[in-house]
Amino acid sequence: MASFQDRAQHTIAQLDKELSKYPVLNNLERQTSVPKVYVILGLVGIYTFLVFFNIAGEFLVNFAGFLIPGYYSLNALFTSGKADDTQWLTYWVVYALLTVVESAINAAYWFPFYYIFKFVLILWMSLPQTNGAQVVFHSFLQPVLGRFFTSGSTSANLRAQADAASKSQ
């Protein structure tokens, strides 16, 4: 069984390999002589520290909640597949719900470490490796709210029924 240090070195090597795909990080490493992995891990550590102690936590979490999902949402607009549309529409519905609820009840005051919870939830829902928004959609939104949005629902196709009735006359 590999020791903790061996696993950490392996993970750092994998992360370094992944980060080597980005020329900006390679240039930064050459100019500063600081390994890009340590720069990224340091920035992630500072970011997490600030969110944990709610030093600009709301801004930092909302920034993270917009940056990555915003990119992937724009990407989804230019593809023809439906799966990514469901992923990102669900993400934005849950994100909007969290934002409205947090402002309505002053969540950061009533729930300690609220921004850590929101940050972890946002990452889980938005990262392509986890597709958590799909889980939220299939586990909660579709079973609970799906009956209000089915094609047979009066509210969902009332306009179509009215148009069909007016054309038949």
From Swiss-Prot:
How the protein sits in the membrane?
Multi-pass membrane protein
Signal peptide positions on this chain: none
* TM regions (residue ranges): 36-55, 57-76, 87-103, 106-124
**Membrane: present as a keyword of the record?**
yes
What's the subunit arrangement here? Oligomer.
**Record family assignment:** Belongs to the DP1 family.
Q: Which PANTHER family match?
A: HVA22-LIKE PROTEINS, RECEPTOR EXPRESSION-ENHANCING PROTEIN
This one is known as Protein yop1
Source organism per UniProt: Aspergillus fumigatus (strain ATCC MYA-4609 / CBS 101355 / FGSC A1100 / Af293) (Neosartorya fumigata)
Q: What is the lineage of its organism?
A: Eukaryota, Fungi, Dikarya, Ascomycota, Pezizomycotina
Gene behind this chain?
yop1
